[in-house]
């Protein structure tokens, strides 16, 4: 409880001192050139396409109040960095917030663009970058939502005002009590997650520990005995924050996620990555044992994942090109980029490596950067109702097993049950004895390796993906954990990099990254650690390449990185 109170206090201080560059953010932004395939209609689809996330009913969110009495949606959530969406599916919702269902059953959710749409500001002008890492404070949003709903469960006056907004002045008999019960049912798992998962040292803007939050939601809120499905002890502090990745060319990598544990290669593998994501972002999912399903589990009876929507979103992402640098520059540095790594070059790790007609090979290397995310991948949890569940050809989950393995089985099982008709149907006892291995195709077999822990060796104990650097200029802060504010700073030895810096939308086009002065999130400053604390989650250590280049060579390299 102390952790929650401190988190809420910190987020409130940050937001109370909010001084957004409102003129730039409110004005229509300049939409950067991201290729001919990326059209306005695709953009709007990307901003609002439902993927099955269910944050809360839309009428509730509209009626919800902040502690000072103002509507929770008063500024369209701009206080957290979310961007205005004039064509939102409901008034007041920002980019990346969705609505599914009808009438009182309309549910607000989140979609890819909430975390992967960026807006930067240069000299008072805002520039929109679709598919870019969002500069949003997701932890503050989560904590404040908890803070807004909590009083409704214990304060009659607060709940009466809330209920009047939803039910009207004269609700039918029993409606108030039913609404109160529904709010309490929503709040118990949500508050359990927030109280246990949000770290004392906040992620801050532009970062989150997505992997931990996926593990926490799935194993802490979804797979316990029904109801209420909770296994609170499975929820761990989400203290390995990373920078949101950019999406352009993500579908061309043969591996995704910062540690490289998610495979790419066909539509089902892309879907596996996205189903895992939506389970972490408010999808309703409660698998149940079922002896009449060939997998021994029913993954779809209580499952809000929108498989069609997820497929459409993956198709949209493939159309997003890297943003073209919109300002004047000298096109230099290509020769330096092409040098060997030990000569200060980049191409050996970050050049395009053609794997096949569809994919690029994505190297996984330990470059000395923060190691915390790898510890998250090794976490053990109680498997709850999923004890004994398995993928075809795989071993059953034990009573205590890896959170990573639970996620892999849950995602593969859901997709197999959805796409392979015989696996989605109930059967009589004789038919249910058929082994699921017998109905697997070459394509569905690839799901069995959709999630694989990265190979850790003595030479590379903590490897992370080395992505192609197209559009890297628009993706600050740098390193996988967002611990370095600019590319200029990244070309310095770790010991000489700045120890702390503010985070926001103001951009420095010369140093290529976050400007030294920010106002968007008030006084928030990200404090990093050095190489002596490599596992802090906030270490600025590692990637000491190009540090010995001359000042002229560094400037030429930065100019070249702007045009990739």
Q: What kind of feature is each model-predicted range?
A:
Residues 1-8:
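N-terminal secretory signal peptides that target proteins for export/translocation
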Residues 11-23:
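Bacterial N-terminal signal peptides
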């Amino acid at each position: 409880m102390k952790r929650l109170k401190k988190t809420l206090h910190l987020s409130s201080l940050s937001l109370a001192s909010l001084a957004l560059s409102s003129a730039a953010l409110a004005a229509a932004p300049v939409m950067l050139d991201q290729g001919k395939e990326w059209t306005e209609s695709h953009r709007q689809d990307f901003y609002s396409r439902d993927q099955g996330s269910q944050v809360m009913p839309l009428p509730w969110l509209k009626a919800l109040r902040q502690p000072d009495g103002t509507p929770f949606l008063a500024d369209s959530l701009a206080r957290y960095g979310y961007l205005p969406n004039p064509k939102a599916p409901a008034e007041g919702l920002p980019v990346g917030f969705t609505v599914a269902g009808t009438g009182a059953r309309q549910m607000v959710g989140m979609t890819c663009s909430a975390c992967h749409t960026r807006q930067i500001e240069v000299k008072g002008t805002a520039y929109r970058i679709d598919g870019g890492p969002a500069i949003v404070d997701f932890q503050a949003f989560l904590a404040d939502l908890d803070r807004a709903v909590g009083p409704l469960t214990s304060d009659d006056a607060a709940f009466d005002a809330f209920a009047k907004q939803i039910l009207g002045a004269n609700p039918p008999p029993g409606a108030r009590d039913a609404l109160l019960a529904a709010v309490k049912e929503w709040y118990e798992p949500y508050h359990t997650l927030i109280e246990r998962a949000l770290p004392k040292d906040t992620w801050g803007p532009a970062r989150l520990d997505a992997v931990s939050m996926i593990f926490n939601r799935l194993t802490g809120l979804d797979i316990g005995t029904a109801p209420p499905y909770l296994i609170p002890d499975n929820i761990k502090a989400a203290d390995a924050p990373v920078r949101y990745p950019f999406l352009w060319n993500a579908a061309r990598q043969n591996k995704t996620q910062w540690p490289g544990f998610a495979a790419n290669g066909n539509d089902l593998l892309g879907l596996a990555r996205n189903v895992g994501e939506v389970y972490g972002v408010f999808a309703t999912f409660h698998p149940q044992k079922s002896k009449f399903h060939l997998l021994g589990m029913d993954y779809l009876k209580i499952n809000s994942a929108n498989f069609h929507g997820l497929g459409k979103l993956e198709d949209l992402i493939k159309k997003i090109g890297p943003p073209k640098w919109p300002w004047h520059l000298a096109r230099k540095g290509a020769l330096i980029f092409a040098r060997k790594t030990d000569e200060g070059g980049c191409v050996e790790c970050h050049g395009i490596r053609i794997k096949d007609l569809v994919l690029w090979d994505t190297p996984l290397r330990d470059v000395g950067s923060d190691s915390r995310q790898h510890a998250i991948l090794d976490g053990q949890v109680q498997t709850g109702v999923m004890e004994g569940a398995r993928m075809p050809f795989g071993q059953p989950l034990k009573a205590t097993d890896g959170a990573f393995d639970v996620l892999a089985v849950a995602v593969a099982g859901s997709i197999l049950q959805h796409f392979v008709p015989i696996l989605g149907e109930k059967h009589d006892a004789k038919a249910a004895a058929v082994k699921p291995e017998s109905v697997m195709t070459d394509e569905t077999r690839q799901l069995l390796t959709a999630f694989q822990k990265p190979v850790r060796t003595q030479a590379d104990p903590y490897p992370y993906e080395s992505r192609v650097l197209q559009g890297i200029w628009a993706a600050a802060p740098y390193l996988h954990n967002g611990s370095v504010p600019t590319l200029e700073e990244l070309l310095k030895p770790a010991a000489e990099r700045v120890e702390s810096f503010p985070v926001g939308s103001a951009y420095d086009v010369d140093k290529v990254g976050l400007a030294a002065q920010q106002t968007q999130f008030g006084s928030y400053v990200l404090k990093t650690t050095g190489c002596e604390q490599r596992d802090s989650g906030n270490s600025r250590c590692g990637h000491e390449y190009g540090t010995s280049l001359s000042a002229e060579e560094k400037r030429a390299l930065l100019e070249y990185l702007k045009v990739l």
